[in-house]
Regions:
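N-terminal Rossmann NAD(P)H-binding glycine-rich loop of SDR-like oxidoreductase domains
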Residues: 10-34
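SDR active-site strand-loop-helix element
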Residues: 14, 41, 79-83, 121-127, ...
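Rossmann-fold cofactor-recognition segment
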Residues: 52-64
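NAD(P)H-binding glycine-rich loop region in Rossmannoid oxidoreductase-like domains
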Residues: 62-100
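Conserved cofactor-binding/catalytic machinery of classical short-chain dehydrogenase/reductase
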Residues: 64, 78, 104-107, 142, ...
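Glycine-rich NAD(P)-binding loop of the Rossmann-fold in SDR/ketoreductase-type enzymes
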Residues: 92, 96-107, 144, 152-153
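Conserved Rossmann-fold NAD(P)-dependent oxidoreductase catalytic core, especially the SDR/UDP-sugar
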Residues: 106-148
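Active-site Tyr-X1-5-Lys
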Residues: 132, 147-173
């Protein structure tokens, strides 16, 4: 990026209307991070967690052709890909689970690849990639043995991020999160 592009830095959060997306957006807005636009994208209209002119909220279906390409540009610095169908829903609706949890990940990676190399791509995975009970110590050598469609989708998403990173298309980071239950 050149200096003028640095002044036009965009951060995108998919799943920006969800629990994690809102927490992340708030942290970014309150932090020292230099950006000109924080784009919150969700299947339902997201809201900004704080009043800030840098925030743009967009209702969009990332499974629709062309949507990812319309969001990501040369000024995109970071994509936080938090959008997903949760485990039970991915089991109940096999096709939708694959479409949202894997196909959308690849579509976003492709949009980053074509916009410019090196966009930071943060993918939220899940401990479901390990399947049943976890060993006492989980490290990089722990085998991925998903026992659900959701776990398989997240494991394949991780492999995609790793491969796109290896090729220099994105600067990928995978975060394996535990189950997060949000209740009022």
């Amino acid at each position: 990026m050149n200096e003028s592009e640095d002044n036009e830095m965009q951060i995108i959060i998919t799943g920006g209307g969800g629990f994690l997306g809102q927490k992340l957006a708030r942290a970014l807005l309150q932090g020292p991070h230099p950006f000109t636009e924080l784009l919150l994208v969700d299947i339902q209209q997201p809201q900004s967690p704080l009043p800030d002119p840098r925030v743009r909220c967009l209702r969009a279906d990332l499974t629709e052709p062309g949507v990812a390409d319309s969001l990501i540009s040369e000024r995109t610095a970071v994509v936080y890909h938090l959008a997903a169908i949760v485990s039970s829903h991915a089991e109940q609706d096999f096709d939708l689970g694959w479409k949202v949890n894997l196909d959308t990940t690849r579509t976003l990676l492709e949009a980053c690849r074509h916009a410019r190399p090196g966009i930071r791509f943060v993918f939220t995975s899940s401990l479901a990639v390990y399947g049943g009970p976890l060993p006492e110590l989980v490290n990089d050598g722990t085998a991925l043995t998903p026992t659900s469609s959701y776990g398989a989708q997240k494991a394949m998403g991780e492999l995609l991020v790793n491969d796109y990173s290896r090729k220099g298309f994105v600067d990928g980071l995978v975060l394996r999160l535990p189950t997060i239950c949000v209740r009022p």
